[in-house]
UniProtKB/Swiss-Prot annotation:
Keywords of this entry: Cytoplasm, Histidine metabolism, Hydrolase, Iron, Metal-binding, Zinc
Cofactor requirements of the protein: Zn(2+); Fe(3+)
Pfam families: Amidohydro_1
Any Gene Ontology biological process: L-histidine catabolic process to glutamate and formate
This enzyme's EC code(s): 3.5.2.7
Pathway: Amino-acid degradation; L-histidine degradation into L-glutamate; N-formimidoyl-L-glutamate from L-histidine: step 3/3
Annotated protein name in UniProt: Imidazolonepropionase
Main subcellular localisation: cytoplasm
Gene source species: Caldanaerobacter subterraneus subsp. tengcongensis (strain DSM 15242 / JCM 11007 / NBRC 100824 / MB4) (Thermoanaerobacter tengcongensis)
Gene that encodes the chain: hutI
EC category name: hydrolase
Length: 415
């Protein structure tokens, strides 16, 4: 057998198996291969198993006893924005509420202003810096949402820039249209006018230019209510978009129920999801994307991961990287939050940031596991075992990232 790249002397491979999201007890079913190798050819995994194997290769990497994991997938981010909001933290510490800050022109509106005013080059450079940080922490595929333009011209601009990122970064980019992220200030007196604008102007234009695979809506009190969210998502579905929902984050907005009724590929946040919402999501095969970075940053309760897993929902994890509620690109930190604060087991967490996260962006056939035929997205981790990586929190355990781009493979040494 002849390979392009051979990774050998791996102490152990940890990987879920398959192409479909895992739920319940299956989330813990991780294949472990000791004293292992991975062979790569034409950007795909040719073979993976126990050493030694009769394989020759043009290039070789000595893993030096490190563990190997599938490349991580971040299924929920807001990478495409400009500016930061650390000044709001200082106000919060002085006792200002989010509404107080919003009335002063802060909150999401300040990010919308900064994003609208930023040049294309400034937005691209900021996004590339964030993607570089994510890659260094083992993330090889990233979902990126629009949502800081909030008018047709700006939302289309952000999506076009996301598509430019695909050729500028080694990280794979999956764009999502989130024109319904917030009600723009100019439409606050009549939010339905903005809903009509999203439906009649934005969605057809996004589809015409093939700028995004998914349509997302922030279904929440103070953003888009159930009926508004339902209307936008129904129209998006008619146009052929796959659906995502920011659901039940701060209140029981019935976003979970809506995700199940409309067959959304994922429902994200879910801190306040109902049993009915869970059951409808389970029936629809919707992936629950949990975002503990938000709970940590806002000092709010975490989503009940154990409840969701035990009721049979496939759970994924993401950073929700954004400047207002989760300003971190570090998915490893999110994994530790899930381990420590959400009582998820190490094997469940690995599934949640690999296969299930891939399925939350419709990539389960291509990535998320170390198996023959899957894309060669692999991370070498300097840790004695899987639990140690989440137990020893706050540092980067990734030593090397192996990333397929087409038929080629890029090797990025982190340490």
């Amino acid at each position: 057998m002849r390979a392009d790249l051979l990774i050998y002397n791996i102490s152990k491979i940890y990987t879920p198996i398959g192409t479909k999201p895992l739920c319940g007890e299956d989330m813990e079913k991780i294949e472990e291969i000791e004293n292992a190798y991975i062979a790569i050819k034409d950007g795909k995994i040719l073979a993976a198993g126990k050493s030694p194997a009769a394989i020759s290769a043009e290039r070789e990497i000595d893993a030096k006893g490190m563990i190997a994991l599938p490349g991580f997938v971040d299924p929920h981010t807001h990478v495409m924005h400009y500016g930061s909001r650390e000044n709001e933290m200082a106000l919060k510490l002085k006792g200002y509420s989010y509404i107080d800050i919003l009335k002063q022109g802060g909150g999401i509106h300040s990010t919308v202003r900064a994003t609208r005013e930023a040049s294309d080059e400034a937005l691209l450079q900021k996004a590339l810096k964030s993607l570089e940080i994510m890659l260094s922490h083992g993330v090889t595929t990233v979902e990126v949402k629009s949502g800081y333009g909030l008018n047709t011209e700006q939302e289309i601009r952000l999506l076009r820039l996301m598509n430019q990122l695909k050729s500028l970064s080694v990280v794979d980019i999956v764009p999502t249209f989130l024109g319904a992220h917030a009600i723009p200030q100019e439409f606050e007196e009549n939010p339905w006018r903005y809903v009509e604008k999203v439906i009649n102007e934005m969605l057809p234009k996004v589809k015409e230019e093939d700028l995004a695979e998914f349509c997302d809506v922030f279904c929440e009190e103070g953003a888009f209510d159930y009926e508004q969210s339902k209307k936008i998502l129904e129209e998006a579905k008619k146009l052929g978009f796959r659906l995502k929902i920011h659901a039940d984050e701060l209140t029981h907005s019935k976003g979970g129920e809506l995700a199940g009724i409309l067959g959304a590929i994922s429902a994200d946040h879910l801190e306040e999801v109902s049993d009915e919402g869970i059951d409808l999501m389970k029936k629809a095969g919707t992936v629950a994307v949990l975002l503990p970075g938000v709970s940590f940053f806002l000092n709010r309760p975490y989503a009940d991961a154990r409840r969701l897993i035990e009721r049979g929902l496939p759970v994924a994890l993401g950073t929700d990287y954004n400047p207002g509620t989760s300003p971190t690109e570090n998915l490893q930190l999110i994994m530790s939050f899930a381990y420590i604060n959400m009582k998820m087991r190490a094997e469940e967490i690995l599934t949640a940031v690999t296969l299930n996260a891939a399925c939350a962006i419709d990539r389960g056939d291509e990535i998320g596991t170390i198996e023959e035929g899957k894309r060669a997205d692999i991370v070498l981790v300097d840790a004695p075992n899987l639990d140690y990586m989440m137990y020893h929190f706050g540092i980067n355990h990734v030593n090397t990232v192996i990333k397929a781009k087409g038929n080629d493979v890029v090797v990025i040494g982190i340490k």
